[in-house]
Amino acid sequence: MRRVVVTGLGMLTPLGCGVDATWARILAGDSGCKKIDTFEVSDLPSQVACYIPRGDGSGGTFNPDQWMEPKDQRKVDDFILYAMCAAKQALDDADWHPKSDEDQFATGTMIGSGIGGLTGIAETAVLLKERGPRRISPFFIPGRLINLASGYVSIEHGLKGPNHAVVTACSTGAHAVGDAARLIALGDAEVMVAGGAESPISRIGIAGFCAARALSTGFNDTPQKASRPYDKDRDGFVMGEGAGVLVLEEYEHAKRRGAKIYAEVTGYGLSGDAFHITSPPPDGNGGFRSMSMALKRAGLAASDLDYINAHGTSTQVGDEIELGAVERLLGNAASKVSMSSTKSATGHLLGAAGAIEAIFAVLAIRDNVVPPTINLDNPSVQTAIDLVPHTSRKRDVNVALSNSFGFGGTNASVIVQRVTN
Amino acid sequence: MSEIGERVKKIVVEHLGVEPEKVVDSASFIDDLGADSLDTVELVMAFEEEFGCEIPDDAAETILTVGDATKFLEKNAKS
């Protein structure tokens, strides 16, 4: 099969607009969480979220007008705007701006979302009830559809290869990276713009996840402490928003044009739990199988892993089940592996999570450093695995695996590794 | 320009993101101001909202320029 490498990165996260802005704050152990202040929360059990920092665009802030025309912003839900921001960063970083038919036909998009335009759908439903169908905007549908993130990005940048989108809840971003890499490996594209975007911080979004008992409710007055994977006081995840996009490219294509190569995507595993709509099975066999499959695909042993970016959302049940599956996978190698949950800092970006976390895995390899699990004061279980509490750590990272698990019992694991010839 | 004309112009500038100077009576929404077919549907909705009147589909089809809109609304505006 053809080899696939990462040649461009772009992200918009609660820690900043841009890869450098986000990564610096991740390594510093910062939290992106704050009290919700954009809608009424007095009747909601969870009142904290990880917002992207909006501003004039300076100092790592997000200025929407730099990424999408104001007249187009009005037509779409924010997840599309966020995808546009991350995709432009990634394409600029890769220095890939296809102009010829050949290059445009060879470049595709696969940007997914967990939920898509939830906010716009909720607002429009109210409008329909109160004012009737004549008030529904012609942009209502195209501005909410999940695949319109890929659609807008492909139109903006003239990308005429595969135009696809993943929808697998919280494993969307990881599936997008893995599936896009596969399209390149099989020869359907030379370059793929892949990732995820999510804009779930709205009254209906928080209310919905609260009803599913998924969100943290005990840290409303200390938001920066709310996301605390593996800690004994964890009580649910914290909703985050943003987007992550990677430019994936066939290895020889990247070499020919002298592209900067960050890492190689060597492993990808997928599995289903067939157990419950929101809970993983107690033995974590779905996650175990997706990790095992990714290792097999990469031709690696578990002992080859240096860093695991965990799914680790900070829920009572999920964190320990994943940890158990990872321990089973690693066996005696557990003590040499570092595993952290960057969701402790970013919150849970749902469909964008797997994409930003694949980027963190790539950056861990680039910089030989592992990002921390912040707020991990008292681990709820003892483990030989280094969970990187509180502070980032320099260490050799040549092989990194990123896990993402989603509602519906869907699991994905992606392995990236340092490029060797 | 009439008061209604000014209000039409404001809506067009806002919805299509174009320079105010370009929004003249003879300007065609699609050919001169960069609108697509969905934009024109939304523009008609915005006119209905602003002027408190209904613009039936057959009338909307005849509103192709800024001047067409102003002329129609000068006759039919309710607010």
UniProtKB/Swiss-Prot annotation, chain B:
A single MF term (Gene Ontology): phosphopantetheine binding
Domain Carrier residues, every copy? 2-77
List the record's Gene Ontology CC terms alphabetically. Answer: cytosol; membrane
PTM statement from Swiss-Prot or TrEMBL: 4'-phosphopantetheine is transferred from CoA to a specific serine of apo-ACP by AcpS. This modification is essential for activity because fatty acids are bound in thioester linkage to the sulfhydryl of the prosthetic group.
| Alphabetically ordered keywords of this record | Cytoplasm, Fatty acid biosynthesis, Fatty acid metabolism, Lipid biosynthesis, Lipid metabolism, Phosphopantetheine, Phosphoprotein
- Tell me yes or no: is Lipid biosynthesis among this UniProt entry's keywords: yes
Q: For this chain's UniProt record, which GO biological process terms are given?
A: lipid A biosynthetic process
Q: What is its subcellular localisation?
A: Cytoplasm
User: Which pathway does the protein contribute to?
Assistant: Lipid metabolism; fatty acid biosynthesis
Database matches in InterPro entries: ACP, ACP-like_sf, PKS_PP-bd, PP-bd_ACP, Ppantetheine_attach_site
Kindly list the residue ranges recorded as spanning the membrane.
none
As stated in the Swiss-Prot or TrEMBL entry, residues carrying the post-translational modification O-(pantetheine 4'-phosphoryl)serine are S37
The record describes the protein's role as:
Carrier of the growing fatty acid chain in fatty acid biosynthesis.
What family is this?
Belongs to the acyl carrier protein (ACP) family.
- The name this protein carries in UniProt is Acyl carrier protein
